[in-house]
Amino acid sequence: MKRALAILVLSLAGCRTSEPAGADPPPQKTEPAAHVAGIGEKATGVELADAPDGDVAAIVRAARDQARAKKRTLLVYIGATWCEPCKRFHYAAERGQLDAEFPTLSLLVFDLDRDGDRLKVASYAPGYVPYFGVPGDDGKATSNAMEGSIKGEGAVKNIVPRLGRLLSGAP
């Protein structure tokens, strides 16, 4: 009987955890995918790749590596669904209207309203959209960026030369 009691006590003691009952498990750190879909997949012209969920700096680093491997230049692009110049630029890029001007440009696309909080963690906090930024080697924002545009039919014509100047200094 003493032996059975001793086994019971020892087995119950082995089941005890240091966590209180009902405690949530610690959060797991999620790593971004090693591959960002849409980066480096287009042979020539502007490519728009929606940024996946996760740590912005890590995603940007992965996307930049992919773009470089394909001899493309990556910029972080932040737009918004309510931004008229963003819509006009996006439309022109999707239809290949900017391919001749920017044959090796890859844009990692974020939405300011959806992604704003996680963008701030990586120092991407534009005052205006659209925002185009050259990422640093750490995946965070650099001062090499441009933001904002005029509204109306001239929006794309306003963005293109400024974007060209930005790219001329991009690594």
Language-model-derived ranges and their functions:
Residues E19-P32:
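Short, low-complexity, disordered segments immediately C-terminal to signal peptides
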Residues G54, A80, D99-D117:
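Thiol-based oxidoreductase modules, predominantly thioredoxin-like and allied folds used
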Residues G14-S18:
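Bacterial signal peptide processing site
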Residues K70-T81:
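Short active-site neighborhood of thiol/selenol oxidoreductases, capturing the structured segment around
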Residues C86-E101:
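Typically the conserved alpha-helix immediately C-terminal to a functionally engaged Cys/Sec
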Residues G54-R72:
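A short beta-strand-turn-helix
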Residues M1-A13:
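Sec-dependent bacterial lipoprotein signal peptides
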Residues G127-P171:
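Non-catalytic, surface beta->alpha helical segment in thiol-disulfide oxidoreductase systems
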